[in-house]
Amino acid sequence: MIKFSDYMIILKGFNMKKYGLLLFLILSISCFSENKKFQQLQKDTVKGKITEEKSISEESTNEIYKDRMKNFIREIRNDAGKNKYIITQNGNELYFRDGKLDRNFFPVTDGTTQESLYYGDVLKYNAVTKKESKDYMLSLLNPVRKEGKPVFVINYAKGNEKKNFLLKEDAKTGFVSELLPEFEARAIYNPIQGFNSENITNLRQVKNYLLLLNPEKFSDINQYFEYLKNTDFDLLLIEPSHNGVFLTKSQVEQLKTKKNGGKRIVISYLSIGEAEDYRGYWKKEWSKKWPKWIVKENPDWKGNYIVKYWNSEWKNVIKEYREKLESIGVDGYLLDTVDSYYYFQEKMENGNKIPD
């Protein structure tokens, strides 16, 4: 990229009166070119992989797959009712239309998350996220937070220096950040802001959270429960089962109280843009022959399959699974893989639209 100072050096050797118009044209074309480059594809984290996306100002006018995901989330909201919390995982372009906040969709959810905003770039632990990626994600997250929606940032790194940096950034942005010790979200960690005994009755009060989505290190569901019960996190974003065995309603109710006695919120993980072959809803025959709504296996996550999330059969699968989660009394859902619409939109833009 040629800097303005470079142009000044060039100008010294020119007769401005004679070549002024020519130089004006050169500078105009160059500035236009650099501006276009700045608005080119930016990177956003999608369930551990990096996907290229256009900036808000150059958003595709065709938002069919984006709208289908929004409609799916609306349906989940309507079924779950207003008393359940809904938090989206990544995919924060969903909150925008034509470069502005989508006022029709914005109130549907109660919070959002963003992976690798500061650390954990391109599945590299401790790696600082590239400036262009970070700036793009912030261009989405800052307006969302300013409108009052809580933003929970998931970073993959360690070290006191990084913790102090995140504390300073959170003070400026209003986000709630954590440093996770690994990408699989199966390990225990201490929160950046420390614990408190306050009663947490809504997401805006949350000062720390535990993200634990793979409880495989625990021997069984009861050991998993005992660990969770003896923590003081304000918010639990968790997988509510272990090897197919779910927490009971009584156990979930107990988890809504911190070890120190304060009240807290318990949110269950729920992937709606990908099917997972380790879930109870997965049928053996699907491993031999995919249902028509499965498109492909996620190359970065074995056993996870991108689905046509607008398909009625898939929606019924999610509805039945969510009814199980309802029965154990969780406070709401962390909706993962909502960003799977990127895959379908990219296919369409490249002339390879996938049939419904």
Question: Where does each model-flagged region fall?
Answer:
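Positively charged n-region of N-terminal signal peptides that target proteins for export
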Residues: I2, K12, M16-Y19
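Sec-dependent N-terminal signal peptides
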Residues: Y19-L27
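Glycan-processing catalytic domains of CAZymes
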Residues: N35-D356
